[in-house]
Amino acid sequence: MKVSASLVLLLAAAVLADDRCPPQDDPEQPPVLLAHPTDCDKFLICNHGTPVVSKCPPGLLWNDSQKQCDYPAQAQCAPGVTPNTEPAPKPSPNCPPEYDPDHMVYIPHETDCGKYYICDPYGVELEQTCPSGLHWNPVVNYCDFPELAQCEE
């Protein structure tokens, strides 16, 4: 019974997240950033209408009004959710030093055509996985049919 209740909550969170991301057909349109429905130290990057979960650096929480990770006193997040205590990842040399939310940076995965990276606001590569059967297409910056993505593993 506990497993069923957990599964229902997990599915409800996934549906909530999917409903929150607006459809994005224009690749030039800036990404939509949203608060995570249950974790204050996470946020959603809407990638062509699909929510991608990202984590704030340790000690910071998502500030939805500023659309960035912030100190807990400024973030005004719901109580009861503890911040991330993992050590902060190091910025990647592949990510630009200045974050521009209007121009997301996507990096193809080095060995897996079904994966890619998004550069977060702190210059860290966040690994993402395409839906089953699709490959990352760096020309259009979204998951695409393998014959169109032309990636060779």
Swiss-Prot record:
Q: Which domain of life is it from?
A: Eukaryota
Keywords assigned by UniProt, alphabetized: Chitin-binding, Disulfide bond, Glycoprotein, Repeat, Signal
Kindly indicate whether the keyword Signal belongs to this entry: yes
Tissue localization of expression is: Adult peritrophic membrane.
Extract the signal peptide range.
1-17
Q: Mind naming one GO cellular-component term on file for this protein?
A: extracellular region
Q: How is it modified after translation?
A: Glycosylated.
Q: Tell me which residues make up the Chitin-binding type-2 domain.
A: 18-79, 92-153
Glycosylation sites per record: N63
Q: What does this protein do?
A: Binds chitin but not cellulose. May be involved in the spatial organization of PM.
Name the record gives this protein: Peritrophin-1
* Gene from which this protein is expressed: Aper1
